[in-house]
């Protein structure tokens, strides 16, 4: 479950239909405890995770400690579903987020509306944190594409519309489309959820998200249209990787401005290797 979903559920159980007013009440409670420490506590549900803080996340972490006591949860449980900054870098321009023991490239974090699985909302009553990350395009449990719009055309973002699955514009239940079914996308979603999916590598979850970041860098996208290519790449590993390196060398030799003798390895293979500095890992056992 995402941290946003948790707060929405707590708000609903305490009689708040709009989570914003619940957060306003929570902030008032926290300010009574320590005005200076909790002055920056957000009342926008989209900014509730510690990583959203512009300067530092200590005050939000302290706030989660207090809220865990109010909701009768262990602090470690509530902090375990929060997204925090992490010092690890997946590439020179890509920092990481950490949730529990799972490290995810920040580049995959969705910036717009968060799509959802209507079946999950109806069956489980909460939202998954995986919905917040590109690459996870299908629900691996219900084999349906995540949606961000109701059939009436209105955007459905659970952070504002809630967890009921009811469109705030037309009042109808949102439903998953069975059109354009992509079994390959579901296989990738299952793999990102921790399942063993051949031919994809059996590695820890953090590495799987790292591979999605790497693939998005070399293919400029990790959307549905590249799912077949992604699976084929691992099906023919390592020959597919050797072929990719060969293409990159040929292209950079042909279009280079400098003479070949002046080229650095970074100039030739930068997109493949330097854009993903965490791969391969120092731990040889984790290498593919």
Question: Where are these predicted regions, by residue range?
Answer:
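Basic, alpha-helical nucleic-acid-binding regions used in initiation and control of genome expression
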Residues: 1-288
């Amino acid at each position: 479950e995402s941290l946003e979903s948790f707060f929405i559920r707590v708000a609903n159980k305490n009689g708040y239909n709009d989570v914003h007013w619940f957060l306003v009440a929570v902030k008032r409670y926290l300010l009574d405890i320590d005005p200076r420490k909790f002055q920056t506590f957000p009342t926008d549900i989209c900014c509730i995770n510690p990583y959203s803080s512009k300067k530092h996340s200590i005050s939000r972490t302290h706030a989660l400690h207090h809220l865990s006591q109010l909701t009768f949860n262990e602090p470690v449980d509530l902090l375990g579903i929060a997204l925090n900054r992490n010092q690890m870098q997946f590439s020179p321009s890509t920092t990481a987020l950490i949730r529990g023991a799972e490290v995810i490239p920040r580049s995959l974090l969705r910036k717009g509306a968060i799509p959802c699985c209507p079946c999950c909302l109806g069956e489980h009553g909460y939202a998954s944190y995986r919905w917040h990350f590109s690459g996870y395009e299908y629900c691996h449990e219900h084999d349906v594409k995540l949606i961000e719009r109701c059939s009436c055309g209105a955007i459905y973002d659970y952070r504002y519309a809630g967890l009921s699955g009811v469109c705030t514009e037309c009042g109808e239940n949102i439903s998953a489309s069975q059109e354009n079914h992509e079994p390959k996308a579901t296989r990738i979603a299952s793999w990102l959820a921790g399942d063993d999916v051949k031919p994809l590598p059996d590695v820890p979850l953090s590495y799987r998200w790292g591979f999605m970041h790497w693939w998005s860098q070399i293919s400029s996208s990790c959307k549905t249209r590249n799912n077949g290519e992604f699976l084929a790449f691992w099906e023919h590993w390592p020959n597919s990787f050797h072929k990719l390196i060969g293409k990159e060398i040929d292209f950079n030799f042909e279009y280079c401005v400098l003479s070949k003798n002046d080229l650095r390895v970074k100039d030739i293979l930068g997109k493949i290797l330097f854009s993903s500095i965490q791969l391969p890992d120092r731990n040889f056992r984790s290498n593919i």
